[in-house]
């Protein structure tokens, strides 16, 4: 037969061997499960006959009870002894041998640094550092003195964290080892400016400014223009002297500013050039603007919402007249203190970040407090005269209403009298109109 036929129809050969002379026989062996050493009945009988004392207290489920709430001071004081067991126990030199791996004699040590084939040197150094740190993570650091007696209270943790900032000698730069810390600032949010939205303006390519322009741009105004045909942003700047004065005035608080000093002072911002703008959306709180206050030793940060890229603008000849209409060559800017309404609107936005320092003020109460007593008396007298005038006007209105009602009644009576005479006249009118209608129908035919 061929190999193909073997897969289709395998041939079965008959086995004609004789039966063995002494075939095996199965023996019947009676077995009782009670006599086995593993039987539950035997264990119960031994447990009942002999007095067995439990070495470990067991509950109904034959389990050892472990209740952490019974440890005194575990949750209230957070005692490090009960939390971390034997981590902080100091061992003798003779007992440290017991902590090593029992298979240390059999293990073959391989120097990982020599394995350089198909691997870069930076990967080898990372694996060595990671291998060394795994053993250090398991062991807790032993502090000088009796560290076990200290409790992990909230106030204790805060004091230890704040104390680390006072020691400037121990701080090191993560990359530059030669750099040392000289001074520290407390990093806090600038809640006074959280009511405004801040952007990053980046001049791209040929739109970058010269050194002279950068010095004169201590204060500047960027005016965006958005139309259906095109959109751009215009940059305005002032003189170097005015920009320095304006910068100092803007940094002052509301209490320090005087309206008398700003009267008549106009800051002229002239248009320098226009730019094409492109807004780049970024995740919030990815970039911050930090303002340092050396007097108080505080660094205030402001979140920057998004980023705007400014590029050199090239205008088509078709749009040039439209651009000239919407461009402004000069902006005249003056400063003043905000009103109560404006301050309340800003404070409501600031309350989301600092509800304690920025609370809304009632506008009516402020107006009453600002007015002197003489003005209040005059206002009360005016209100009384206005009240008497209003009463006189109300009386006149009532008299006019009564006269109108009387006139309407007389007109209704006259209409009723006319209605009685109208039926006869109406019939006459209808009879006179019928022949005219008949004439019109004949003419149409």
From Swiss-Prot:
One GO process term, biological-process aspect: positive regulation of transcription elongation by RNA polymerase II
Gene Ontology molecular function terms on file: chromatin binding; RNA polymerase II C-terminal domain phosphoserine binding; RNA polymerase II complex binding
Residues that bear Phosphothreonine: 422
Transmembrane is among the record's keywords: no
Localization per Swiss-Prot or TrEMBL: Nucleus, Nucleoplasm
Modified residues (Phosphoserine): 147
One GO cellular component, as annotated: Cdc73/Paf1 complex
Biased composition (Basic and acidic residues): 373-387, 414-445
UniProt superkingdom: Eukaryota
Keyword Kinase applies: no
Acidic residues bias locations: 361-372, 388-397
Segments for region (Disordered): 358-445
Record keywords, A-Z: Activator, Nucleus, Phosphoprotein, Repressor, Transcription, Transcription regulation
Pfam family, one: Paf1
Family annotation (InterPro entries): RNA_pol_II-assoc_Paf1 (IPR007133)
Functional summary from the UniProt entry: The PAF1 complex is a multifunctional complex. Involved in transcription initiation via genetic interactions with TATA-binding proteins. Involved in elongation. It regulates 3'-end formation of snR47 by modulating the recruitment or stable association of NRD1 and NAB3 with RNA polymerase II. Also has a role in transcription-coupled histone modification. Required for activation of the RAD6/UBC2-BRE1 ubiquitin ligase complex, which ubiquitinates histone H2B to form H2BK123ub1.
Subunit comment: Component of the PAF1 complex which consists of at least CDC73, CTR9, LEO1, PAF1 and RTF1. Interacts with FACT subunits POB3 and SPT16.
Homology family: Belongs to the PAF1 family.
Additional remarks: Present with 1040 molecules/cell in log phase SD medium.
Protein name: RNA polymerase II-associated protein 1
Gene coding for it: PAF1
């Amino acid at each position: 037969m061929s190999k193909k036929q073997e897969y289709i129809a395998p041939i079965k050969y008959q086995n004609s061997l004789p039966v063995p002379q002494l075939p095996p026989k199965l023996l019947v062996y009676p077995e009782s499960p009670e006599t086995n050493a593993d039987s539950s009945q035997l264990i119960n009988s031994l447990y009942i006959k002999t007095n067995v004392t439990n070495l470990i207290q067991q509950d109904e489920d034959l389990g050892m009870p472990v209740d952490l709430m019974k440890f005194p001071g575990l949750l209230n004081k957070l005692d490090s002894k009960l939390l971390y067991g034997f981590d902080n126990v100091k061992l003798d030199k003779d007992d440290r041998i017991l902590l090593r791996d029992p298979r240390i004699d059999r293990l073959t040590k391989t120097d990982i640094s020599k394995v350089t084939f198909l691997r870069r040197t930076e990967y080898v150094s990372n694996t060595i550092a990671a291998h060394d740190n795994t053993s250090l993570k398991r062991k807790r650091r032993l502090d000088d003195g009796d560290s076990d007696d200290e409790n992990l209270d909230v106030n204790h943790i805060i004091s230890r964290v704040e104390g680390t900032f006072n020691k400037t000698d121990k701080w090191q730069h993560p990359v530059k080892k030669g750099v040392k810390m000289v001074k520290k600032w407390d990093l806090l949010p600038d809640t006074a400016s959280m009511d405004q939205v801040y952007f990053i303006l980046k001049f791209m390519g040929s739109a970058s400014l010269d050194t002279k322009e950068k010095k004169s741009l201590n204060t500047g105004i960027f005016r965006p223009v958005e139309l259906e045909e095109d959109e751009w942003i215009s940059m305005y700047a002032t003189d170097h002297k005015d920009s320095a004065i304006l910068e100092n005035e803007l940094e002052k608080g509301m209490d320090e500013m005087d309206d008398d000093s700003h009267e008549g002072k106009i800051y002229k911002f002239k248009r320098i050039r226009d730019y094409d703008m492109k807004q780049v959306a970024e995740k919030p709180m990815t970039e911050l603007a930090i303002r340092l206050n050396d007097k108080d030793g505080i660094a205030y940060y402001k979140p920057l919402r998004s980023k705007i890229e400014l590029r050199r603008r090239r205008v088509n000849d078709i749009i040039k007249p439209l651009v000239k209409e919407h461009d402004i060559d000069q902006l005249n800017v003056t400063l003043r203190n905000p009103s109560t309404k404006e301050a309340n609107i800003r404070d409501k936005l600031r309350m989301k970040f600092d509800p304690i320092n920025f609370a809304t003020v009632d506008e009516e109460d402020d107006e009453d407090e600002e007015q002197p007593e003489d003005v209040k008396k005059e206002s009360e007298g005016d209100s009384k005269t206005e009240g008497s005038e209003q009463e006189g006007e109300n009386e006149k209105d009532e008299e006019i209403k009564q006269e109108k009602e009387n006139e309407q009644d007389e007109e209704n009576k006259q209409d009723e009298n006319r209605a009685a005479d109208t039926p006869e006249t109406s019939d006459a009118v209808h009879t006179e109109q019928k022949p005219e209608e008949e004439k019109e129908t004949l003419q149409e035919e």
